Amino acid sequence: MQLSMSFLIGFGTLVLALSARTFDLQGLSCNTDSTPGLIDLEIRRLCHTPTENVISCEVRYLNHTTINLPAVHTSCLKYHCKTYWGFFGSYSADRIINRYTGTVKGCLNNSAPEDPFECNWFYCCSAITTEICRCSITNVTVAVQTFPPFMYCSFADCSTVSQQELESGKAMLSDGSTLTYTPYILQSEVVNKTLNGTILCNSSSKIVSFDEFRRSYSLANGSYQSSSINVTCVNYTSSCRPRLKRRRRDTQQIEYLVHKLRPTLKDAWEDCEILQSLLLGVFGTGIASASQFLRGWLNHPDIIGYIVNGVGVVWQCHRVNVTFMAWNESTYYPPVDYNGRKYFLNDEGRLQTNTPEARPGLKRVMWFGRYFLGTVGSGVKPRRIRYNKTSHDYHLEEFEASLNMTPQTSIASGHETDPINHAYGTQADLLPYTRSSNITSTDTGSGWVHIGLPSFAFLNPLGWLRDLLAWAAWLGGVLYLISLCVSLPASFARRRRLGRWQE
């Protein structure tokens, strides 16, 4: 009995350890090559209380439908190669890859020799220009919807497809490729509904908000009209209490001034214009993580995106189980393993195939559902930090005392024991920790600008030797011609002065 109990306990502990090691960390796998979704971020809805000032409105709007449409995707690229030939067989080549936007029949392979290409008194060379055109034609399925963006593609961004292009049966995408399909005319049905909306009373213009649309609309005489929606609210003033008028003699001078200014300040804050400007300004410039804000605002944890002029550009992702790998390279994002492949987990929880570089020895505190601490180039996996917010209710005096609990000790290490110091110096006055909140950030710390480790991929000794010998032969030939030109006049003068050689 005791043996069986110990076996069960050991087996359960092993299962828990394996499950914790395998499924403890999750990342977002996102296809950003697909068409993103566009959504208007109505920040003013933050000021609306769903249970107060509720009114009934008649709403007339167009329904949205989505259908699948077969199409043919054509992508053509033209490879331009120009090869130069000079003395002693030395050559160089220029390679350019351009998008070809013409017809498939016009995508021809040809070569045009130019001989001589360039020739002057010290150098001659010829050139051959070769253009190779390649096209890939693929049968695909796209989704057509009655609201913009009108077309969704999983293989490219089809946001630029217009209604006219849908009706014509051909569209050119932003990357230069083309789509051909059966012409399609967008049609929408009109829907009439009675919805409960929340009206904002403390505003110069009455604003009604609907949770079904996640939008707010400014009412003019109780109605709002546009090409896609009509809103009519009859009793839009019944739920708003009238403002009380007070006179100067009722209060003191200071109180009267505050009383007169309070409605203006209240309108400014409750209209959320200031809050909207701050939020869109911060998240629209890339200073902070727009994906985190979009997840909280749209109440969807599995999306990424950014904000452009108050419009959220959003991609749908799905969660996958990943595991940390040994951080043995100079990468800013930690390496993770997913299905046997190496990826990098950025600060927004997204799996990437590339990453900015970072200084070896840089310590990073990261949040992936839990706090983790990792060191760049340490060869060790990031470790979890045990942190409980409820146990950190510090009094200020206790908090200050907890910062320096031991005397400062300087551990000096020379270049022989610490190669990082040999490469970068001690860097004692710089912040060793860092965090990044931008999807494109390469900043690796406060006050420290990262320039990256040198890359030695350009080292090619055999190529250098070939070029050196070629130029040495060319220079030797030129010097021989110069010496010949200098010696010939002297030889002719000597022959004229001494005559022919006779025995």
Curated annotation (Swiss-Prot):
Annotated site (Cleavage): 249-250
Keywords annotated in UniProt: Clathrin-mediated endocytosis of virus by host, Cleavage on pair of basic residues, Fusion of virus membrane with host endosomal membrane, Fusion of virus membrane with host membrane, Glycoprotein, Host cell membrane, Host endoplasmic reticulum, Host membrane, Host-virus interaction, Membrane, Signal, Transmembrane, Transmembrane helix, Viral attachment to host cell, Viral envelope protein, Viral penetration into host cytoplasm, Virion, Virus endocytosis by host, Virus entry into host cell
Taxonomic classification: Viruses, Riboviria, Orthornavirae, Negarnaviricota, Haploviricotina
Cytoplasmic side: 489-503
Protein name: Envelope glycoprotein p57
GO cellular component: host cell endoplasmic reticulum membrane; host cell plasma membrane; membrane; viral envelope
Region (Fusion peptide): 274-315
Gene Ontology annotations of biological process type: clathrin-dependent endocytosis of virus by host cell; fusion of virus membrane with host endosome membrane; virion attachment to host cell
InterPro entries (alphabetical): BDV_G (IPR009344)
Origin superkingdom: Viruses
